[in-house]
Each structure stands twice: as structure tokens, then as C-alpha cells.
Amino acid sequence: MAGTVTVPSASVPSTPLLKDELDIVIPTIRNLDFLEMWRPFFQPYHLIIVQDGDPTKTIRVPEGFDYELYNRNDINRILGPKASCISFKDSACRCFGYMVSKKKYVFTIDDDCFVAKDPSGKDINALEQHIKNLLSPSTPFFFNTLYDPYREGADFVRGYPFSLREGAKTAVSHGLWLNIPDYDAPTQMVKPRERNSRYVDAVMTVPKGTLFPMCGMNLAFDRDLIGPAMYFGLMGDGQPIGRYDDMWAGWCMKVICDHLSLGVKTGLPYIWHSKASNPFVNLKKEYKGIFWQEDIIPFFQNATIPKECDTVQKCYLSLAEQVREKLGKIDPYFVKLADAMVTWIEAWDELNPSTAAVENGKAK
């Protein structure tokens, strides 16, 4: 007699990937009602909420989520004088959450980012895709024309060196956005009604030696591999620049990943970016950066890190010194930023003493 095969119901939830190894970091100034939409995907995970702005304001978090919430008073209490390296009145404050996390992986998302749908109409579990990206290797040393060769249905194309097919460890997964594009203020002004409706089903590795503008609103990374480099700089209140926090972190991170032979992926997953920020306010924040970036980009393109720098911390301190020496000639702000970069590493090592001497990759 044939046995009966029981097929599990589709409604039975699968075990969340890395449930005990990943923190979700959210910077905010408002109630987190947007979490209701993300509940099916986020509820099993621990949240770190970094409250920006007025610390006396109460932030409402929907019931049922496991979270810690830190405001400016908490940041000052925990870091003391070193709290000066954490931005105020700017989403760059999120990096405090990276510092206090004790998990191997971090996913960060903005509070105006909703669940997107794929072309079939299915809700996209952005976190699951980020985890897939981080757990599979990257290909920074040779470009594969089928993009990610480790995805189901893909492979290395003819002519791809067999010696490089093992790939490199993936440090960062950079996701994209439907609806409101991540444009700078001048582009926002000339294209106020533009919306991104193109869903490109692809994940690719950013090649070694290539920089890119990292966006922090849909981003995941391996904290053990690259965490100390994910400093979002000095932005916002009291600073001459804003809206360059995630890009600054991305440029520093990419130079260090290249040095340590680590990989960075971009593409899937998509989120739905619901709200356009004010382009006139953005222009005031970005104004100096629009000019400065013409010097900042060549600086990072030409930056070299000594081979003896075999940890992220050593690499980052080397970059900080170069920022002080070279970009400091452009504006005194960069001397202040370089000091903050050093303070950030000191604070990171105080809160994470076991990671201070860990080799993160292989220096090239």
C-alpha cells in the first residue's frame, strides 16, 4: 500500500533566515506605523531604533516588535564626549545603531520605505533577498555578463577564469527603490514628477576599483566584515553639509572592501520609496557637497591603503589621515570630519572590544 505524503500548507511560516544573527536599524523622528506593513517580514527580528531630534518626544512603535530605542540623551550617556561623532538632526544618526548592535548582520531602512511588489504582484521580502545576497559570494575581480552567477538559473559565462569562480566574501548588499528615485536636489527640481517603475531582476557585484553612490534607505551589511567602515559622517545640525552621509560611508567602505578583497552587491531587493523630500530644502543641504564631490570622488579614486592595514579599523584610520591631509585643504570641515572618523573608531572599539584586532579580509 502506498504511503501518504503530507504536503505542508503554504500558510506555515518558514524559519526566518538569520533570526538571531541580524538587527534591523531604523532612524526616525516620527511614529513607526510603517512597521505594520513590514510585520510579516520584520517581526521575528530585533529592531534598533535611533530617534533623531527632540529626545523628549515619544516615538510610538506598534505592539509585538522586539526593539531597543535610543534617543540623543542615550547616545550622550553611552558615548560620553565621543558622542560628538554622531550626527544630530540627520539620518546619519543611524550609524549609532550599527555601533551598539551585537549581531553579525545589519539591515537598515528608512521609515518612508514600504513593501514593494514584484511584476507578478507578490510582496517583496526585501530582508530575505539581502540575506541571500550577503550569504553568497561576490565577483569583484572579473565581471560576469550574466550578473550574479550564484543565483538559481545563472552561472559563470564562457571565458570566466576558473581560478576566480570561488568569488569573494560579500560585505554589503545595496538595494534599490521603486516609485520615488534617490535623486539629488537639482535633478529633483527638473524632474519633479518622475517615478521609477522599472523592476530589473538582477543583482550584480560592483567591480573592484569602481565607486558608487551608496543609499542608506535599503541597505544590509556584514557587520563582522565591514562594520567599522559604515560611519555616516558628520552631517545635519551644526554642519555645512547634509544628504551625503550614506554616500560618504559608501566611498570609504568601497575603498576598504577593495583593499581587503571583499565584495559589494547592488540591485535586488526593491522597496517602495513613498515620499519625496523637499528639493529646495535638499538643495540647501547639498549645495556645498555638489561642488565638493568633484574633489571628493577623485580623492577616493586615488586613495591607497598601506598593505599592513589588515583590519577595517586600521584601513579606516589610514583613510581618516588622508582625508585630513588632502581634503582638509578644500575646507576646514574635512579636518573636523577626519577627527570624527578617528573618534568613531575609538568609540566602536570601546563598545566592541573583541572586534578591534580581527582581520577582516586579505589585503591586496
UniProtKB/Swiss-Prot annotation:
Q: List this protein's GO terms for biological process.
A: cell wall organization; plant-type cell wall organization or biogenesis; UDP-L-arabinose metabolic process
Residue numbers of motif DXD motif?
Answer: 110-112
Q: Where is this site: Required for activity?
A: 158, 165
Can you name a GO cellular component term?
A: Golgi apparatus
Primary location class: Golgi
Question: What is this protein's pH dependence?
Answer: Optimum pH is 5.5-6.0.
> Keywords of this protein's UniProt record, alphabetized?
Cell wall biogenesis/degradation, Glycoprotein, Golgi apparatus, Isomerase
Top-level taxon in the UniProt lineage: Eukaryota
Q: Which cofactor does it need?
A: Mn(2+); Mg(2+)
**Record flagged with keyword tRNA processing:** no
Record's comment on post-translational modification: Reversibly glycosylated in vitro at Arg-158 by UDP-glucose. Reversibly glycosylated by UDP-xylose and UDP-galactose.
Which top EC class is given? isomerase
Annotated glycan sites:
158
A Pfam family found in this protein is RGP
Catalyzed reaction equations: UDP-beta-L-arabinofuranose = UDP-beta-L-arabinopyranose
What does the UniProt function comment say about this protein?
A: UDP-L-arabinose mutase involved in the biosynthesis of cell wall non-cellulosic polysaccharides. Catalyzes the interconvertion of UDP-L-arabinopyranose (UDP-Arap) and UDP-L-arabinofuranose (UDP-Araf). Preferentially catalyzes the formation of UDP-Arap from UDP-Araf. At thermodynamic equilibrium in vitro the ratio of the pyranose form over the furanose form is 90:10. Is probably active as heteromer in vivo.
- Kindly state the subunit structure of this protein: Heteromers with UAM2 and UAM3.
Q: Which family does it belong to?
A: Belongs to the RGP family.
Name by which UniProt lists this protein: UDP-arabinopyranose mutase 1
Species whose genome carries this gene? Oryza sativa subsp. japonica
Q: Read off the lineage from the record.
A: Eukaryota, Viridiplantae, Streptophyta, Embryophyta, Tracheophyta
